């Protein structure tokens, strides 16, 4: 039984499901599409930053260095590393008693 295709209706004897055990191809297709939609939605919410970054920039990791002399490549790498390095002098150590 799928929660996506069940329809409960009141009868004299209580509640019962009309579509229980249905082998209608339309019901089966709707169930499969619903389950796939749910899976894709969950994956999108979990990995949306990665997915959209991949769509926007592709698999590029940074600007191309093709045709650039090695000395300039090294200078660029050093600038990037300096931008990432953190100066420990900006932090204040607080000790709780």
Swiss-Prot record:
It holds the Pfam family Flu_M2. One of its GO terms (cellular component) is membrane. The modification Phosphoserine is found at residue 64. The record marks 37 as: Essential for channel activity, possibly by being protonated during channel activation, and by forming the channel gate and the selective filter. The chain crosses the membrane at residues 23-43. The record marks 41 as: Seems to be involved in pH gating. Residues 60-80 are annotated as: Disordered. Residues 1-22 are virion surface. It is found in: Virion membrane; Host apical cell membrane. Homotetramer; composed of two disulfide-linked dimers held together by non-covalent interactions. May interact with matrix protein 1. Forms a proton-selective ion channel that is necessary for the efficient release of the viral genome during virus entry. After attaching to the cell surface, the virion enters the cell by endocytosis. Acidification of the endosome triggers M2 ion channel activity. This is Matrix protein 2. The lineage of its organism: Viruses, Riboviria, Orthornavirae, Negarnaviricota, Polyploviricotina. The gene is M.
